């Protein structure tokens, strides 16, 4: 809920994929790991922070997207459980959209006194890769042939993650 390393984490999604693999968008969605965190626990127990402008941004999103990440739910996980669900195999690359995810996840790991989910040098920025590698790239996005962008539910962690993989693997 902000752009600081101490920000509350609402939710996260990870999709393990083989860079040489062939996947449909739906297959990527189906293999995603989704974690919804308990925001109140983070504020109460770890003094994590909330930015007012981020709350205002969330309030402008669709009801469905807010129900997935922003609203309290029955699937909210403790910070400790959520972090463990995000922990990956050693020497696996994590692609993220910018550096914020790494900062906040590493920070909450410090709060929990557990190791980061992966080494700092295993993180990669998907926007930079797309901008450098794809001819149609613009600000970290590119065209994906035979893919309907309308299928992406913007700001839904799993959909955003799957779309990033689609652009990285199949973008032009």
Task: Please provide the spans of the model-predicted regions.
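Metal-dependent nucleotidyl/phosphoryl-transfer cores and adjacent nucleic-acid-binding surfaces
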Residues: 1, 5-9, 15, 77, ...
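Active-site-proximal helix-loop-helix substrate-binding element of RNase H-like nuclease domains
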Residues: 38-46, 52-56, 124-163
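Residue-level signal for well-ordered alpha-helical scaffold segments within enzymatic catalytic domains
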Residues: 81, 85, 103, 107, ...
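Substrate-recognition/cap helix-loop segment adjacent to the acidic, metal-dependent catalytic center
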Residues: 87, 100-121
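Short, loop-centered acidic/histidine patches that primarily coordinate divalent metals
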Residues: 97, 110, 129
């Amino acid at each position: 809920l902000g752009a600081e390393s101490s920000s509350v984490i609402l939710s996260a999604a990870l999709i393990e994929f083989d860079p040489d693999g062939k996947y449909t968008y739906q297959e990527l969605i189906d293999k995603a790991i989704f974690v919804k965190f308990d925001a109140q626990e983070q504020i109460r127990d770890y003094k994590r922070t909330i930015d007012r402008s981020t709350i205002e941004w969330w309030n402008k999103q669709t009801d469905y997207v807010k129900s997935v990440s922003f609203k309290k739910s029955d699937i909210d996980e403790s910070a400790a459980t959520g972090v463990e669900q995000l922990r990956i195999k050693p020497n696996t690359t994590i692609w993220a959209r910018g550096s914020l995810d790494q900062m906040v996840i590493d920070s909450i790991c410090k709060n929990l006194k557990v190791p980061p989910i992966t080494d700092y040098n295993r993180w990669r920025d998907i926007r930079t890769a797309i901008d450098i590698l794809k001819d149609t790239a613009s600000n970290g996005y590119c065209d994906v042939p035979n893919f309907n962008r309308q299928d992406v539910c913007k700001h839904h962690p799993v959909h955003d993650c799957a779309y990033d993989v689609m652009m990285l693997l199949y973008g032009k």
